[in-house]
């Protein structure tokens, strides 16, 4: 189809398609004209006056209502009077006011594409003749910091940065091979924190089956994961891991630890009952059985004692009210409680100390030590005496202490036992030096004097004479011994 030159120009001028040109300035000028037409169309939409077809011009020759005219009028009216500034401030209250540098060019000249005196020639000239201004320049950063965001660190560099506590994303390690190499690199650093950090990433991005399978052949990382799961209390994942590794005993122990999260005593007791048949070792199985039995008895004792305390009919609960519940307490604490509140009960009751001793196979030393502390706290000295008194087959009585009488003396003194009680048990200490030290420490004067006399140690007796009160019975006793002619002193 043949067209004349005039037809082609008419086509390109009337068509919405623009001919390609290598002239950048013409291209920019056309874009500016398009922008001007868009702005004028907005003005036509907003303007509701009936005389839209009348073009009004200002004293400068610019059409009234154009963008340049609006900017000048707004700047002139708002900046000239305080009322105008307040009005402008009210209209722009939702925006942050930024200081604007004074401008020497008008937007109308840009839209027309022609120059004005004292202004820039054109937009293209302004861009080409003047240096580019950046009103919000980006601060320069070290090149190394940009690598944190571009994620171009190697495996070794990533692990090194993790070790130093630097920011380093692991998300770029997407394939299983890359993740496993990252884990091996972390293990080779022998840093538990780095290994744990990588394991947390693998735990989040890998399925349980793949994670467990790969850790099964990496024992160092496996131990770190087990420790981490125990620390955060993720029992479910820990049970799945032990089940995958076929570690029956550790699986049972992890299941047993879940009782710590059960607060209700009855529910905890029922849970412990389900743990009895789990594949524990022989020693652990006995402990689990004892734990269940102990909690079962504590529930019975607690209910009975709460009733006795509320009724107020028992002297021991009136004089010494309970400070805490016995539920979920250790075995030794339960034994102390029984020795304190139920010491005289018969062996057939659950709260009897003797019953607890036999049921849980409490050693004699532990039982005597606990019972002594409980009865001495109540100042029940007859019970203390009976605790250490034994009879032989001929009916003779003898005092015997599985824990040693030196410990008995210390516990009695801690509970403010009378001097007569202390002296009785200090005399039962077999080692002479220990006896003298305890007697001197707790001011058992008669024991010190008699021991020095038996040792025929005149110098030590004279030295002790200066420690007693003058004119006291102890001083008179020392003087009588020193003046005795029947004693052959060794010094």
From Swiss-Prot:
Compartment(s) where it occurs, according to its Swiss-Prot or TrEMBL record: Cytoplasm; Cytoplasmic vesicle; Early endosome; Recycling endosome
Keywords: Cytoplasm, Cytoplasmic vesicle, Differentiation, Endosome, Phosphoprotein, Protein transport, Spermatogenesis, Transcription, Transcription regulation, Transport
Residues bearing PTM Phosphothreonine: 21, 115, 130
PTM-bearing positions, type Phosphoserine: 119, 122, 128
Record GO biological process: cell differentiation; collagen fibril organization; collagen metabolic process; endosome to lysosome transport; intracellular protein transport; post-translational protein modification; spermatogenesis
Keyword Transcription assigned: yes
Note: Vipar-deficient inner medullary collecting duct cells display abnormal expression of membrane proteins such as Ceacam5, structural and functional tight junction defects and reduced E-cadherin expression.
Role noted for this protein: Proposed to be involved in endosomal maturation implicating in part VPS33B. In epithelial cells, the VPS33B:VIPAS39 complex may play a role in the apical RAB11A-dependent recycling pathway and in the maintenance of the apical-basolateral polarity. May play a role in lysosomal trafficking, probably via association with the core HOPS complex in a discrete population of endosomes; the functions seems to be independent of VPS33B. May play a role in vesicular trafficking during spermatogenesis. May be involved in direct or indirect transcriptional regulation of E-cadherin.
The protein's name in its UniProt record: Spermatogenesis-defective protein 39 homolog
